[in-house]
Amino acid sequence: TMFFAQSNVIKEVASKHSCVIVGRCANHVLEKFDDCINIFIYSNIESKIKRAVEEYKLDSNNIEKILKERDKLREKHYNYYTGKVWGDARNYHACFNSDFIGINNVVDIIEKIAINR
């Protein structure tokens, strides 16, 4: 399946290089890699809508519905392939609420974690 093909590529890349992998159940795929940092970033729907419209220039019509559907698909995919719960803090080394912290601060924190680990 596509999941297993992606998993093999993720493992291969991670075993050879320093990398950042967004999504793809990478925290689960790389759980046996000791030098991996697993992070979950989340925000409320209002912030997601604002970012989608401002940053990605998406049309604001139906964007809330689209974003909720995407999150639901992500959740189903993650839960199915990992047997874990998407967004459950126990599955990650750190979780950040980008509404509270701000996305640029989240990036700075992650960078500091990676450098000092």
Model-derived regions, located:
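Short, polar loop motifs at secondary-structure junctions
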Residues: G23-H28
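Short, amphipathic alpha-helical "lid/cap" segments that border enzyme active or binding sites
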Residues: S7, I103-E111
